[in-house]
C-alpha cells in the first residue's frame, strides 16, 4: 500500500510549497490524475482530499506532469511509485526517457516511508536506471536531505549509496 507514502508526500509537498525559492506541484494518480497543487497551502486538505483507488497509470501521470514543466533544467520530478504500470508500459518508458533527456532531474521513490522498499517492478526500475534515473525507497527523515542534494544537482545514486539506500542503479553499476 502506498498510504504512508501519500501522507508523507502531502506533508513534504506542503513544506516545499511554503518555500519562496521553489515552485512546488503535487500530482496524485491511480488510473486518473488529480493535481493538488492549489491545495498545498493546507496540508490537511491535501491529506484528506486524496482518495486513491486501485490501479496505476504512470504514463498518464507523466503525460500530465510534462504539461507543467516550463524549465526542464531547473525541474526536479519526484515519482513515488512501485513502478507497476497498469497503463501503457512501453509508452511510459519512452515518455520518461523524453522527460529525462530534456534535462529534468527525475528521482523515483519506491516508497516514502519507514517500512523500506516494497515489492516493485524490477524491470521498470532497471529501465529507469538505464536512463540514469535512480529508484530507491527513502525514509521521511532523509527526504529533506534528498531534496537538498537534488537542488544542488548532486549525483542522486551516489547520495543514496552514502545514506545506505540501495538504488536499482547502484545495483547495476
What are these regions (language model features)?
Residues 29-34, 113-115:
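Short glycine-enriched loops at secondary-structure junctions
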Amino acid at each position: 500500500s502506498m498510504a504512508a507514502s501519500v501522507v508523507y508526500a502531502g506533508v513534504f509537498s506542503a513544506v516545499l510549497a511554503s518555500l519562496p525559492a521553489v515552485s512546488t506541484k503535487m500530482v496524485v494518480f491511480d488510473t486518473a490524475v488529480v493535481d493538488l497543487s492549489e491545495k498545498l497551502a493546507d496540508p490537511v486538505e491535501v491529506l484528506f482530499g486524496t482518495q486513491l483507488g486501485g490501479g496505476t497509470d504512470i504514463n498518464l501521470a507523466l503525460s500530465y506532469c510534462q504539461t507543467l514543466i516550463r524549465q526542464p533544467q531547473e525541474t526536479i520530478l519526484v515519482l513515488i511509485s512501485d513502478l507497476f504500470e497498469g497503463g501503457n508500459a512501453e509508452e511510459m518508458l519512452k515518455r520518461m526517457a523524453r522527460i529525462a533527456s530534456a534535462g529534468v532531474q527525475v528521482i523515483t521513490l519506491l516508497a516514502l516511508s519507514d517500512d523500506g522498499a516494497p515489492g516493485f517492478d524490477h524491470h521498470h526500475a532497471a529501465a529507469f536506471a538505464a536512463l540514469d534515473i535512480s529508484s530507491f525507497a527513502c525514509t521521511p527523515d532523509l527526504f529533506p536531505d534528498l531534496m537538498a542534494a537534488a537542488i544542488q544537482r548532486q549525483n542522486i545514486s551516489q547520495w543514496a549509496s552514502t545514506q545506505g539506500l540501495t538504488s536499482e542503479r547502484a545495483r547495476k553499476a
